[in-house]
């Protein structure tokens, strides 16, 4: 990338407000301030969306929808302050979509309209200069040049590889969240043949000790992190590239199992 104009991108996922890990969020702000990104990308599940869940609430989930709005607004203002001059993007994750988009097994449409973040003055003001992708699915993504951003749907390694090939570009990078598993930059392979596709995952930003519904899950590989990218041509739209025109790394704040 020598001699070419590059842009810096900072990307995180799964804050699950209001149960965001405070130590992680403070660390995140410091990382953003130090990196001075041109773009901020939030891969989704910004809201926990407790009131849109289909199952019984745990006694520890004792907050209301306004608490989630206040938490997101507070976080958005802090990110805005830490990333002055940056363009900011939020893609809906499954929790956000369940909360704010019509679904037959979730909230009634009139309740969604009343509780939508755009109807909350505090949240809508804090997010006024964010570009928001208000949909979610395996084929929903945001692309900045050779970098493809998505919340992600599949949790399996094979499914993540499939989504990478389907929706990113040759010699491009796919950045996704959803799994809560931070992963280093990896190049896809097929029967030991390397493919020109790459992926990376920042992990999550939630305090999983406050997630009773994941208590029985194997969280050994769960962690909190941030993906930092430097890329050429992020303001251009191309469907394929002849070579890798970016660099990326994941920085880890903490892991569920600190032996890893």
Name every feature range the model reports, one short phrase each.
Residues 87-95, 134-138, 239-245:
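Acidic carboxylate-rich catalytic motifs and surrounding loops in phosphoryl-/glycosyl-chemistry enzymes
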Residues 8, 12, 17-125:
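Core catalytic region of metal-dependent phosphoesterases/phosphodiesterases
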Residues 22-23, 130-132, 156-159:
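Short gly/ser/thr-rich secondary-structure transition/capping motifs
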Residues 230-260:
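A short C-terminal boundary segment appended to hydrolase-like catalytic domains
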Residues 147-242:
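Conserved beta-sheet core of the metallophosphoesterase superfamily
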Residues 26-29, 76-77, 135-141, 159-164:
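A generic local structural motif
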Residues 1-10, 141-148:
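Beta-strand-turn-beta hairpins that frame and shape the catalytic cleft
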Residues 111-146:
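Metallo-beta-lactamase
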């Amino acid at each position: 990338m020598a001699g070419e104009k590059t842009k810096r991108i900072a990307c995180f996922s799964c804050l699950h407000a209001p149960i965001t890990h405070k130590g992680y969020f403070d660390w995140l702000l410091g990382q953003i301030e130090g990196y001075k990104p041109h773009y901020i990308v939030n891969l989704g599940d910004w809201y926990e969306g407790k009131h849109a869940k289909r199952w019984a609430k745990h006694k520890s989930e004792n907050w209301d929808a306004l608490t989630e709005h206040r938490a997101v607004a507070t976080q958005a203002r802090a990110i805005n302050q830490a990333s002055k001059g940056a363009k900011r993007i939020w893609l809906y994750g499954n929790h956000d979509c369940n909360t704010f988009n019509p679904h037959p097994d979730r909230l009634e449409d009139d309740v969604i309209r009343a509780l939508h973040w755009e109807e909350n003055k505090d949240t809508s003001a804090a997010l006024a200069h964010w570009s928001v992708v208000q949909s979610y699915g395996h084929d929903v993504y945001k692309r900045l040049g050779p970098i493809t951003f998505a919340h992600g749907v599949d949790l399996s390694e094979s499914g993540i590889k499939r989504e990478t090939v389907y929706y990113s570009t040759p010699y491009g990078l796919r950045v996704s969240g959803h799994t809560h598993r931070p992963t280093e930059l990896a190049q896809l392979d097929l029967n030991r043949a390397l493919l020109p596709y790459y992926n990376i995952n920042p992990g999550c930003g939630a305090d999983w000790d406050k997630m009773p519904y994941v208590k029985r899950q194997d969280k050994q590989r769960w962690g909190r992190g941030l993906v930092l990218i430097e890329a050429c041509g992020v303001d251009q739209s191309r469907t394929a590239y002849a070579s890798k025109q970016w660099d990326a790394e994941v920085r880890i704040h903490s892991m569920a199992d600190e032996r890893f």
